[in-house]
């Protein structure tokens, strides 16, 4: 079974519209390596799982799990954020993730704008028998 963050990475990296702004090699899972934390390498994306838990039980077996994902987008300009973020939101919505929180700030560590968005989805547990 693929981890939820891997599923999101695949969704984002295989989209041509998003790839025209963010090189798929600039989409990171969990952390951005220090060598890649460079303003000249922006825009970039980081995907983190915030929380997950099983739900919807039948006969004492979980049928689904709920997962919260955070996607951080770093850009050099506000215009880049305005162009890229709607693509991410649309892709997540098309894949049954509902956006429920966001924050926009200037990352003082690397002097880039950071758009952090949180998404939630309920996924079926794929039981292989």
Residue ranges and their predicted role:
Residues 39-41, 61-65, 109-113:
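A generic structural micro-feature
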Residues 63-76, 113-123:
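Oligomerization/assembly interface segments of phage tail-like spikes and tubes
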Residues 85-129:
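Acidic-leaning, charged glycine-interspersed low-complexity segments
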């Amino acid at each position: 079974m693929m981890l939820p963050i891997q599923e999101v990475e695949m969704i984002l990296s295989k989209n041509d519209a998003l790839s025209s702004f963010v090189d798929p090699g600039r989409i990171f899972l969990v952390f951005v390596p220090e060598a890649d934390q460079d303003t000249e390498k922006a825009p970039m994306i980081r995907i983190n799982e915030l929380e997950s838990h099983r739900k919807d039980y039948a006969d004492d077996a979980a049928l689904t799990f709920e997962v919260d994902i955070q996607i951080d987008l770093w850009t050099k300009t506000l215009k880049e954020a305005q162009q890229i973020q709607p693509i991410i939101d649309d892709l997540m919505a098309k894949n049954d993730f509902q956006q429920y929180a966001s924050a926009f700030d200037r990352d003082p560590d690397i002097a880039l704008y950071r758009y952090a968005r949180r998404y939630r989805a309920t996924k079926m547990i794929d039981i292989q028998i």
